[in-house]
Amino acid sequence: MVREEVAGSTQTLQWKCVESRVDSKRLYYGRFILSPLRKGQADTVGIALRRALLGEIEGTCITRAKFGSVPHEYSTIAGIEESVQEILLNLKEIVLRSNLYGVRDASICVKGPRYITAQDIILPPSVEIVDTAQPIANLTEPIDFCIDLQIKRDRGYQTELRKNYQDGSYPIDAVSMPVRNVNYSIFSCGNGNEKHEILFLEIWTNGSLTPKEALYEASRNLIDLFLPFLHAEEEGTSFEENKNRFTPPPFTFQKRLTNLKKNKKGIPLNCIFIDQLELTSRTYNCLKRANIHTLLDLLSKTEEDLLRIDSFRMEDRKHIWDTLEKHLPIDLLKNKLSF
């Protein structure tokens, strides 16, 4: 962290990207500025964002590989230059981009002699390879070579116990960390009581997302982390005691949305992202394509607006309401539905 004195003026708090570049397919760089901040705030924001960027961003990677008739991971396979362990290490380095949730299957099936690269991986439609030239193995003889793979979206470093699997399946220590490094520096500006701070934030990613996307996701995760403090229950009110006392009548979807919009005082709806609502991937993608990112965005739409969204169905309409009933606090629903 660096501190310097620079000239500056007090303005409304704002941020912008001052530098962005692509060093390689697997190395993106971005530099951002946030100002003006009061003394001490830059450290607070910088530390929080750095930790969130390095530990809270989700990434997609290969978590398991299954070979046929391989006794252990240190085995060699006839006609292949690399050992099984070396192939597993190469698969661990493959950088993937996706918005999938849960485990997905992929595979490699080729005939030698030839080099196997990431381009040879057969992936589900929702997953793409960042660098198709990443090496996997070298087949030196005319053999058929197949691997079954598992792909998962997660965060952080996931370690599995090493053991031999009789079916030839081996876990891969997954590194779901799209952000490779984060630095921040603080610059002081102004004089006397008018002194403020400017925060510079540098982000390097592996290409599965841009530094700007990583900054957005880290900020959203921090907002999600603090939201419970904004919705603290009133003293003497127990959610467990009241959660089963309210059953909404069979309103039409439009009436429900209208009533939800009536009173926004109890909760900052623009701070509730649709990611938090656990919508199905289909419904979520429909809303995202329509630039609906928060609960406030959703409640600003009429039923007709939603039905005009490409691929949006009547079933999605019902699913949205059922999800709102499930996730919004009971006292909030009482206020907003005003029965």
UniProtKB/Swiss-Prot annotation:
Question: Among the entry's GO cellular component annotations, what is one?
Answer: mitochondrion
The Swiss-Prot or TrEMBL record annotates one GO molecular function as:
protein dimerization activity
A Pfam family cross-referenced in the UniProt record is RNA_pol_L
Record-linked InterPro entries:
DNA-dir_RNA_pol_insert (IPR011262), DNA-dir_RNA_pol_RpoA/D/Rpb3 (IPR011263), DNA-dir_RpoA (IPR011773), RBP11-like (IPR036603), RNAP_asu_C (IPR011260), RNApol_insert_sf (IPR036643)
- For the region Alpha N-terminal domain (alpha-NTD), give the residue spans: 1-233
What does it catalyze? RNA(n) + a ribonucleoside 5'-triphosphate = RNA(n+1) + diphosphate
Keywords annotated in UniProt: Chloroplast, DNA-directed RNA polymerase, Nucleotidyltransferase, Plastid, Transcription, Transferase
Report the locations given in the UniProt record. Plastid, Chloroplast
List every stretch annotated Alpha C-terminal domain (alpha-CTD). 264-339
Which domain of life does the protein's organism represent?
Answer: Eukaryota
Does the UniProt entry include the keyword Chloroplast? yes
Which residues, by range, are in coiled-coil regions? none
Tell me the Gene Ontology biological-process terms attached to this UniProt entry: DNA-templated transcription
Q: What is its EC number?
A: 2.7.7.6
SMART domains assigned:
RPOLD
Q: Which family does it belong to?
A: Belongs to the RNA polymerase alpha chain family.
**What does the subunit section of this Swiss-Prot or TrEMBL entry state?**
In plastids the minimal PEP RNA polymerase catalytic core is composed of four subunits: alpha, beta, beta', and beta''. When a (nuclear-encoded) sigma factor is associated with the core the holoenzyme is formed, which can initiate transcription.
Q: Please provide the record's free-text comment about the domains of this protein.
A: The N-terminal domain is essential for RNAP assembly and basal transcription, whereas the C-terminal domain is involved in interaction with transcriptional regulators and with upstream promoter elements.
Q: What does this protein do?
A: DNA-dependent RNA polymerase catalyzes the transcription of DNA into RNA using the four ribonucleoside triphosphates as substrates.
- Protein name in the entry: DNA-directed RNA polymerase subunit alpha
